[in-house]
Amino acid sequence: MTVLFILSAGLVAVFGYLVSWFIYCRTLHPLSKVPGPFWPSVTRLWLTYAVSRGELDVVQRDLHRRYGPLVRIAPDEIACADPEAIRKIYSTTSPLNKSDFYHIWDVGAFSKYPNAFAIVDENMHFERRRIVSSVYSMSTVLTLEPYIDNCSRLFVKRMTERTVPHEAIDLGDWFLWYAYDVIGELFFGHSLGFIENRGDEGGFLASLEVMLPVLTIAAASSPLVRGLIMGLFTLSSTARKGLKGMNHIIETARASVDKRASAVAEPGKGERKDLLHNLLNIVSSKGDKLDFGIEDVKNEAFAALTAGADATMIELQAIFYYLVKDRSVYEELRKEVDQAVETGKLSEFPSYSEVVQLPLLKATIKEALRLHPAVGFTMPRVVGQAGIELLGMYIPPGWKVGMNAAVVGRDEGVYGTDANTFRPERWIERTDSDMDRCNNLVFGAGTRTCIGKQIALSEIYKMVPLLIRKFDFALVDPSKSWTTHDYFFNKQSGVQVKVTVRGL
């Protein structure tokens, strides 16, 4: 009887707590007036589940269609789809701190400082980023074009050798190999060998594929259960494979930087002027003053290895997917590229300064990035002490707000009623600052714009016309669509194409 009474009392207490919590979240909570479904307003498990399915971009677009530009996606978090809010949430003058979503991404453990992506405090981020910002500027990236071209030449050579008219290839694989080999050229003084070997022989890339969904699900979860999620994951054989691969990546970054630092210290050596050289230059010239040492360079190298290639791969794949789906745009772009080559305006391996003069090329790249940004996630920020007003609604300090480029990029008020359609001409027909501002969200916005943005854009702009000129791409089955997997990076699969050499 006593046991039964205790169990009954416990159930009543739990039920009473849940009812009280539900009433509070729905009626008294500072975010209770923000529209949205019931479950996100009372538990973060709804968001965790949505993330675990790998389709948060699709879910959020549907939520905003149903509930409007402000939607509550967790008891303490709002997703905003109002283009005007970009300036407020991702301000360059009064930036908001990142939320605890980013804590879990501080992996690598080289420096006493987190990697730039995982730093949540804006003051610390400002101090650390300004140390290396010049290294990643477009003016510096343009000096690195010969190293990017090394990978492009090998890409064309290996694809030409491999291509059989009726043999399909996975474009995503090839673009990922290319992007990682460029990272190798820029950070480690040599290609990582993916294009040369036409594969992931060491399981390097596979380990990242294993880790990304788990880290993303844990990051989106309540801090109270993140440890549990990661703990359960580490018990699996899949986890051991992923962690082994991650340790290999850590050691690759460590060994490569140490080897290069030793070479630079020797007279007559270290003449290769790549990105790693520029970072080591900071260490030798003002490292003590800036508290920036070899371990911080390893942080940069590790960040490049774990996140520096995905955006390039995703966007290159998106561009060619939309082109082979819409042959009319493909043919027009090929005419533009061919004409530029024939009139001497475009080199065989184009420079960035040449390709940005091609209007349809620029429009095509912008349009593909708009429709399928590399990151399909809300980038949450914590409202500061002054609070913030969004669409006439005051959001008090301490709550989380964010925007998803995969939602904002399809805003019909900005891009028109055909916002879900691939139509590059929209970028040529009119000049609109709102269009560019929304599209800039693809690489983040404000003070937290992706530091590798210029590297990615340089690779993309140079590679697209090169491949358009050298090859012809066609979908194996034009009736099929790709499959996307939105675990922070919104990766695609199933883009099988036939490739033929044009012979020009």
Curated annotation (Swiss-Prot):
Q: Per the record's keyword annotation, is Iron included, yes or no?
A: yes
**Enzyme class at the top of the EC tree:** oxidoreductase
Q: Where does heme bind?
A: 450
Q: Which UniProt keywords apply?
A: Glycoprotein, Heme, Iron, Metal-binding, Monooxygenase, Oxidoreductase, Signal
The record's listing under Gene3D superfamilies reads: Cytochrome P450
Q: Which residues form the signal peptide?
A: 1-16
GO MF, one example:
oxidoreductase activity, acting on paired donors, with incorporation or reduction of molecular oxygen
* Name of protein: Cytochrome P450 monooxygenase gsfF
